[in-house]
Amino acid sequence: MSIFRADKKFERFEDVTPKILKDEKVKLLLCDLDNTLRLHSEKEPADELADWIEECRDAGVLIVIISNNGRKKMMQKFCEPIQVPCVWWAKKPMSTKLTETMKNYNFKPEETVMLGDKWSTDVLAAKFAKIRAWKVDHRKSVV
């Protein structure tokens, strides 16, 4: 497994379906926020994001947002309506916050995936944490 390559690639987060998560035995999905789940300029969760999170939750997958964004109040305000835990100021590509999150929620590396848009932060952090890295294209517009 090369640290220079994502394990799977998708166009957008919505392409990561509950079926894929189940087939891949994913129980914890760590997601980047900016330009992965939302445009950087979006202040509130889009309906598509809320629906996708609910589908994943119904499939038994815990989603935790892990972001390098350091604005705690903004992160909490965004994550609260969709009832998703968030970790801010993650300092990716360092893997500390990823491994802490797995430990805090009692998940093993083989049950965990990091989903993000950047090789230099999200994919590398996943590789350093010894979990799978799934990459989505940089989000440019709301679907």
What is the role of each PLM region?
Residues W89-S95, D137-V142:
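Short, acidic/turn-prone active-site loops that include or flank metal/cofactor-
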Residues M1-C31:
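Non-catalytic pre-domain segments flanking phosphatase-related domains
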Residues L115-V143:
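Acidic, Mg2+-coordinating phosphoryl-transfer loop and its flanking beta/alpha structural elements
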Residues L29-P45, L49-Q76:
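Substrate-recognition element of Asp-dependent hydrolases with the DxDx(T/V) motif
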Residues F78-K91:
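Structural recognition of alpha->loop->beta junctions
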Residues M94-W119:
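Conserved Lys-Pro-Asp/Glu-containing loop-to-beta segment of HAD-superfamily phosphomonoesterases
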